């Protein structure tokens, strides 16, 4: 059987509202078992993640003393080598090494201990320019190493002798803020005192105020909360030298654009602005013209969809959707799956249906309490459940590398939404599967999205080749069909 199943699923955790409907998770190995490599990655994530009411605090500083002449690489605690196939989204590089950028040794140690062996294309393009202090407008696919592309130069440029906020990363969702802060903390752990803080709406404001009373070098935040802290005079940003807008298209949409304008006005005039996104609508161009000074433009988007994601559709009626999902669960070899619905109400209804079928699942949406969202995100990322039902809350930048299947239970209306949804699989050049349940009313949308993205969504075959989305079916890396 492809996913965890029990005859009597039970609700576990804080309450039924916390998004955790789960039975026991099937052991790794065998059909749907995930394999040893995925399990090792989950264990690494489990060790790395800490959540404290939405505020990430630097773990006890790790200062590594290395004597002159020591081979410092021998002291590293490297994760298991990732032997899964990778596509040219992340392998078509210029052959640079992280050492080529003259980074601090302590930062290099954190990079290598993250399992980052060589810079991806977006990192090769971005890191040297960001280190020079120039503004950047970067367009690259989700899941190709954007976080590292800005966090590495950001950390390199910190002056740890100073006790003020020197860099800010603004992201559109709380979950993404937690994820980016965890990465930042891990990469900087050998730097001996780099203080990283995440602050988001929905968490205790008093805790954030107390945290900012101590030294903080890097703030990773959602727009509304950081602007609130700036206006209260708690977050002092007069020494900020770099601000990053991750998922810039969302941050500069109608929901956030005025808040972002207000934040920029509080910063020094000589600050550096880095914009990263997969899509750049007119709102981003307008912001760029107003605030960026001769930006260096990076465009790694000759095609929009990830090379490693195979896309299918199944033509169904609304009443057939749950039965079709049940069939997919039984036939696919799922490491972890994310299932998208178009409303919070449908998320909860579907999660309940899935548990009634005997499969364990979590669910998450924007109307849940923040502590429940944090718990679901943390536990799913750590591999405690195989299936997650969610809204588009979970599309922006969330990186869970064990996810190899994305299912659009409800087909999205916008091409941009579709692009971000299917980008939850096939992360960092790995393989993934995107399956769309299409009703009669969705048929025009399907055609429109194919045309806008320049991609092909094929009818689902009776048997899906496991080599398209299961890493263990590749004994050695292969190139993209000779390109």
Curated annotation (Swiss-Prot):
Its Gene Ontology molecular function terms?
Answer: ATP binding; ATP hydrolysis activity; mRNA binding; RNA helicase activity
The UniProt record lists the Helicase C-terminal domain at: 308-468
For the keyword Glycosyltransferase, the answer is no
Ranges spanned by the short sequence motif DEAD box, renumbered to the chain: 246-249
List the catalysed reactions: ATP + H2O = ADP + phosphate + H(+)
> Would you kindly state one Gene Ontology biological process term found in this protein's UniProt entry?
P-body assembly
Query: Where does this polypeptide localize?
Result: Cytoplasm, P-body; Cytoplasm; Nucleus
Q: Boundaries of each Helicase ATP-binding domain copy? A: 127-298
Give me the residues that bind ATP, please: 140-147
Where, by residue number, is the motif Q motif?
96-124
GO cellular component term of the entry, any: cytoplasmic stress granule
| Record keywords, A-Z | ATP-binding, Cytoplasm, Helicase, Hydrolase, Nucleotide-binding, Nucleus, RNA-binding
Q: What is its EC number?
A: 3.6.4.13
- Say which family it is in: Belongs to the DEAD box helicase family. DDX6/DHH1 subfamily.
Q: What does this protein do?
A: Essential for the formation of P-bodies, cytosolic membrane-less ribonucleoprotein granules involved in RNA metabolism through the coordinated storage of mRNAs encoding regulatory functions. Plays a role in P-bodies to coordinate the storage of translationally inactive mRNAs in the cytoplasm and prevent their degradation.
Q: What is this protein called?
A: Probable ATP-dependent RNA helicase DDX6
Q: Which organism is it from?
A: Gallus gallus
Q: Which gene encodes it?
A: DDX6
């Amino acid at each position: 059987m492809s996913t965890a199943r029990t005859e009597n699923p039970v609700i576990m955790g804080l309450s039924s509202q916390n998004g955790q409907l789960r039975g026991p998770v099937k052991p790794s190995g065998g059909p749907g078992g995930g394999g040893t490599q995925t399990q090792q990655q989950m264990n690494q994530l489990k060790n790395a993640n800490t959540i404290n009411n939405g505020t990430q605090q630097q773990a006890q500083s790790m200062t590594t003393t290395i004597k002159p002449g020591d081979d410092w690489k021998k002291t590293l605690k490297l994760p298991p080598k990732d032997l899964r196939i990778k596509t040219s989204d992340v392998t078509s590089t210029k052959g640079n090494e992280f050492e080529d950028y003259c980074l601090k040794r302590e930062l290099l140690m954190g990079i290598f201990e993250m399992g980052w062996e060589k810079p991806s294309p977006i990192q090769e393009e971005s890191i040297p320019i960001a280190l020079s202090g120039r503004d950047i407008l970067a367009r690259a696919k989700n899941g190709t190493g954007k976080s590292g592309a800005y966090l590495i130069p950001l950390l390199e440029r910190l002056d740890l002798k100073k006790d003020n906020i020197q860099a800010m990363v603004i992201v559109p969702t709380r979950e993404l803020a937690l994820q980016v802060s965890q990465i930042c903390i891990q990469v900087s752990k050998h730097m001996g005192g780099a203080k990283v803080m995440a602050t988001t709406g929905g968490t205790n404001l008093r805790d954030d105020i107390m945290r900012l009373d101590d030294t903080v070098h890097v703030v990773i935040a959602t727009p509304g909360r950081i602007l609130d802290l700036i206006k209260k005079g708690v977050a002092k940003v007069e020494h900020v030298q770099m601000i990053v807008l991750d998922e810039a298209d969302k941050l500069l949409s109608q929901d956030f654009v005025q808040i972002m304008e207000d934040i920029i006005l509080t910063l020094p005039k000589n600050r550096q602005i880095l914009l990263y996104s997969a899509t750049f609508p007119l709102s981003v161009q307008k912001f760029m013209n107003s605030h960026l000074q001769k930006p260096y433009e990076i465009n790694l988007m000759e095609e929009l969809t990830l090379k490693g994601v195979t896309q299918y559709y199944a033509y169904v009626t609304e009443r057939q959707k749950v039965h079709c999902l049940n069939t997919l669960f039984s036939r696919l070899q799922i490491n972890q799956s994310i299932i998208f619905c178009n409303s919070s109400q449908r998320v909860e209804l579907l999660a309940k249906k899935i548990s009634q079928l005997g499969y364990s699942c979590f669910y998450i949406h924007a109307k849940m309490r923040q502590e429940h969202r944090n718990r679901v995100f943390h536990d799913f990322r750590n591999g405690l459940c195989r299936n997650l039902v969610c809204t588009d809350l979970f599309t922006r930048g969330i990186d869970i590398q064990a996810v190899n299947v994305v299912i659009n239970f409800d087909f999205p209306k916008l091409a941009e939404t579709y692009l971000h949804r299917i980008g939850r699989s096939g992360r960092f050049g790995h393989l993934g599967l995107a399956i769309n349940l299409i009703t009669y009313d969705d048929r025009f949308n399907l055609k429109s999205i194919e045309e806008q993205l320049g991609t092909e969504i094929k009818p689902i075959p009776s048997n899906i080749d496991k080599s398209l989305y299961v890493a263990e079916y590749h004994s050695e890396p292969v190139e993209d069909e000779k390109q």
